[in-house]
């Protein structure tokens, strides 16, 4: 199992903006130094807490400072931009990263972003599909372009000057294009079936209960099989809220106590989900009333904390429940205590992951030996 990083992010709204951006930058650079395989950041234009306004721009700002880690948009909210702008920016970014880009896409989940871009009352899922189809068509064909849709048109036919390069759009370095990644939130996601059928790879959100995260694998398998694509659990990424600290009392206090950035994170999410009728994500029983949801219960279910050994055991228990997956995405939270936050990432890479992978190897050997014995 690989370890990666994913942040929306969510910071206190009274935190200095420059400081929060620098902390997010340092988290990505630390992830690279620690050997994390990949890292993603979200984008939200109208949220003072979720305050990275362009995931592509943020990634571009750290491209030359990273060496090995793959960087991903997490995600580009497709209905909020013109497909030609997205195609050009992502193509350039892939070259800036020398092919280390993962292209994360979604319809966007922040209602105020949809409103500010004039999409609140439109079919954003339909816009999402049209936008990504146009982006891929731009990368597939040569100029001049004349791509027509319901929401956008892309054309350079009237102004094409091929001999001097005018009217020609850039293509990504990776061929035919960077891996396309989609975030998955809904249980039993039909959207994931369609995404998998197109060869896109899923990230299961860290704010999903294990009961619902495990429903994503069958949807992914169904989509792959419908298109005759190879089914590989290495392509499934699962995000989790994790805090590692060798002082167990301190671990619990930072994860669940007063002033915890983890509790703040889930308070923000719960408030939004309740407002927009999506609080079912936090319910084991879908018949449960919204008024019965308790922040404390949600945090206890979704935040993994403790010593390196304890966290490794909890992650293995989680894996046993949801099934095998290729990459565990360590969810980035506000660095309320910079030293504790950094140390947690270090322990995750240096202590937790080796124990997890040693355990997985032993289980695989045991399974292989058992199969050999059965076959004799």
Named regions from a protein language model:
Residues 9-21, 78-83, 178-186, 302-306:
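Active-site mouth loops of central-metabolism enzymes
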Residues 306-321:
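A short, acidic, amphipathic alpha-helical segment used as a generic capping/interface helix at domain edges
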Residues 3, 62, 93, 135, ...:
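Conserved, mostly hydrophobic/aromatic
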Residues 366-371:
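Conserved small/polar residues in nucleotide/adenosyl-binding loops
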Residues 1-15, 110, 164-176, 287-300:
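N-terminal small/glycine-rich loop or linker at the start of catalytic domains
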Residues 82-198, 214-218, 225-227:
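Internal, glycine-rich beta/alpha segment that forms the wall or movable "lid"
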Residues 1-71, 177-178:
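N-terminal beta1-alpha1-beta2 module of alpha/beta enzyme domains
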Residues 3-5, 39-41, 71-73, 101-105, ...:
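Hydrophobic faces of well-ordered beta-strands that scaffold small-molecule active sites
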């Amino acid at each position: 199992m690989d370890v990666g990083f994913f942040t929306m992010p969510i910071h206190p709204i009274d935190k200095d903006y420059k400081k929060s951006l620098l902390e997010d930058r340092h988290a990505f650079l630390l992830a690279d130094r620690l050997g994390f395989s990949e890292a993603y950041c979200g984008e939200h234009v109208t949220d003072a807490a979720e305050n990275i306004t362009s995931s592509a721009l943020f990634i571009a700002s750290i491209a030359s400072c990273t060496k090995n880690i793959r960087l991903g948009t997490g995600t580009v909210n497709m209905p909020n931009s013109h497909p030609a702008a997205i195609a050009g920016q992502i193509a350039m970014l892939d070259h800036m990263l020398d092919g280390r880009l993962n292209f994360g896409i979604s319809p966007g989940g922040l209602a105020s972003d949809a409103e500010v871009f004039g999409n609140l009352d439109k079919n954003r899922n339909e816009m999402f599909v049209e936008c990504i189809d146009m982006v891929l068509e731009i990368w597939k064909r040569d100029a001049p372009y004349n791509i027509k849709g319901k929401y956008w048109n892309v054309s350079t036919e009237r102004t094409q000057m091929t001999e001097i390069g005018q009217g020609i759009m850039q293509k990504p370095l990776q061929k035919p294009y960077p891996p396309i990644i989609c975030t998955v939130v809904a249980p039993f996601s039909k959207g994931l079936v369609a995404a998998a059928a197109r060869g896109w790879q899923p990230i299961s959100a860290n704010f999903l209960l294990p009961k619902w995260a495990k429903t994503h694998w069958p949807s992914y398998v169904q989509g792959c099989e419908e298109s005759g694509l190879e089914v590989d659990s290495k392509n499934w990424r699962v995000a989790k809220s994790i805090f590692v600290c060798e002082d167990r009392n301190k671990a619990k206090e930072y994860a669940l106590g007063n002033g915890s950035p983890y509790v703040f994170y889930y308070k923000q999410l719960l408030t939004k989900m309740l407002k927009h009728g999506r609080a079912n994500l936090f319910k084991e029983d879908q018949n449960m009333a919204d008024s019965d949801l308790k922040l404390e219960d949600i945090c206890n279910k979704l935040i993994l904390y403790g010593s390196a050994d304890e966290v490794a055991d909890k992650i293995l228990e989680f894996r046993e429940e949801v099934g095998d997956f290729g990459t565990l995405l360590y969810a980035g939270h506000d660095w309320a205590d910079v030293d504790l936050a950094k140390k947690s990432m270090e322990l995750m890479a240096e202590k937790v992951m080796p124990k997890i992978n040693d355990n997985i190897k032993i289980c695989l050997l045991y399974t292989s030996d058992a199969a050999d014995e059965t076959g004799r």
